[in-house]
């Protein structure tokens, strides 16, 4: 949703828009004036969705039995709802991809990559690895009557190295949480996690 001053969802004044003009449309109430100060919205924020239950079931079935019609059925139910072609075979990479696109902007990615032990491979600190680089989508409105894009919003992807010069680096020690000393003192069977 573009909310810039000249965007299609123009705010009432320039104090009510963000710097880029972008908001994530997912779970956003687009009713006019829904976000106005002093008014509320009836849009609920989901904590757990049916798609999450399907993806958990697909992953568990795949881990227990390998690629089965059961796990494929769960994935294809989500793909059908989204209007995407069904898969004929299932790999672990398909499950990773489905989680990434289904839960985009919902805060699942970090935890998924930790659970699958993939975070250190994807965010490996290599400046040549696109997955380890921060990128941004930059919009601008073309105002040139001689241009074919006149009056249209154009977007380009920009590498954010001038703002965030270092690539994302997830180290093995980041997989482990820390036990509080009180827990360790109260239970002699608990041992500290590595890197703690």
State the predicted function of each range.
Residues 44-78, 93-102:
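Extended, hydrophobic/aromatic-rich amphipathic alpha-helical segments that build helical scaffolds
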Residues 19-32, 70-73, 80-83, 100:
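Charged alpha-helical initiation segments
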């Amino acid at each position: 949703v573009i909310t810039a001053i000249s965007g299609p969802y123009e705010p009432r004044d320039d104090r009510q828009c963000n710097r880029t003009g972008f908001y994530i449309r997912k779970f956003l109430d687009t009713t006019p004036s829904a976000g106005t100060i002093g008014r509320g919205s009836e849009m609920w924020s989901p904590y757990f969705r049916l798609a999450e239950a399907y993806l958990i079931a697909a992953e568990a079935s795949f881990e227990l039995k390998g690629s089965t019609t059961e796990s494929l059925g769960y994935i294809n139910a989500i793909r059908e709802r989204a209007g995407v072609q069904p898969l004929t075979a299932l790999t672990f990479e398909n499950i990773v991809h489905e989680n990434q696109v289904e839960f985009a902007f919902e805060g699942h990615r970090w935890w998924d990559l930790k659970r699958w032990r993939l975070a250190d491979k994807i965010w490996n600190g290599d400046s040549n690895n696109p997955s380890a680089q921060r990128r941004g989508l930059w919009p601008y409105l073309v105002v040139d009557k001689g241009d074919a894009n006149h009056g249209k919003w154009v977007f380009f992807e920009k590498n954010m190295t001038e703002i965030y010069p270092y690539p994302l680096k997830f180290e093995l020690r980041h997989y482990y949480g820390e036990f509080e000393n009180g827990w360790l003192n109260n239970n002699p069977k608990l041992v500290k996690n590595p890197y703690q």
